[in-house]
Swiss-Prot record:
PANTHER family: DNA REPLICATION COMPLEX GINS PROTEIN PSF1, PARTNER OF SLD5. The keyword Phosphoprotein does not apply. This is DNA replication complex GINS protein PSF1. GO terms for biological process: DNA strand elongation involved in mitotic DNA replication. It comes from Bos taurus (Bovine). It is found in: Nucleus; Chromosome. The gene is GINS1. Belongs to the GINS1/PSF1 family. InterPro entries: GINS_A (IPR021151), GINS_bundle-like_dom_sf (IPR036224), GINS_Psf1 (IPR005339), PSF1_C (IPR056783). GO terms for cellular component: CMG complex; GINS complex. Keywords: Chromosome, DNA replication, Nucleus.
């Protein structure tokens, strides 16, 4: 059946939970592109035959194949675009370093796009707020308090707070730190927010 493989790509993303990135389906995408190539070649052959011999009975078949080509194209673009939106959201959620499990699900082109997006965002943030720039990825929601209690999940080493004091982050140690300094480490899984 025409367009089934393309629809399966879209269904695959639809079934994935919000914020999750399923593995890049290179094989499915290749099958869709091969189907599109076959449809295009069949259409070209029928168009040439219809022109040369004046066969009007081929027109509905040509139109049907053309509609199938357009549907395959829309599904493919929707699949790739939705993946890029999810990858962009991952940059805001995890920061500039993605966990290896997420990188494993991305194609080489998607990793390249992520790196270019990351650099573009970093350049923009450096252009804001004076010498140090402004990190717009912090405080995605307004904080209720400026300091939070955190527990260290992994040995991290020394961590410098903005006033110059250093805190040693060892596994299972608890600290009271500025929220904006630890949000990145919370996203990376080094710290966890202790809710009292």
């Amino acid at each position: 059946m025409f367009c089934e493989k393309a629809m399966e790509l879209v269904r695959e993303l639809h079934r994935a939970a919000e914020g999750r990135l399923p593995a890049f389906n290179e094989d499915g995408l290749r099958q869709v592109l091969e189907e599109m190539k076959a449809l295009y070649e069949q259409n070209q052959s029928d168009v040439n035959e219809a022109k040369s011999s004046g066969r009007g009975d081929l027109i509905p078949t040509i139109k049907f194949r053309h509609c199938s080509l357009l549907r395959n194209q829309r599904c493919t673009v929707a699949y790739l675009y939705d993946r890029l939106l999810r990858i962009r959201a991952l940059r805001w959620e995890y920061g500039s370093v993605l966990p290896s499990a997420l990188r494993f699900h991305m194609s080489a082109e998607e990793m390249d796009w992520f790196n270019r997006y990351k650099k573009s965002l970093a350049t923009y943030m450096r252009s804001l707020g004076g010498d140090e720039g402004l990190d717009i990825t912090q405080d995605m929601k307004p904080p209720k308090s400026l300091y939070i209690e955190v527990r260290c999940l992994k040995d991290y080493g020394e961590f410098e707070v903005e006033d110059g004091t250093s805190v040693l982050l060892k596994k299972n140690s608890q600290h009271f730190l500025p929220r904006w300094k630890c949000e990145q480490l919370i996203r990376q899984g080094i710290l966890e927010h202790v809710l009292s």
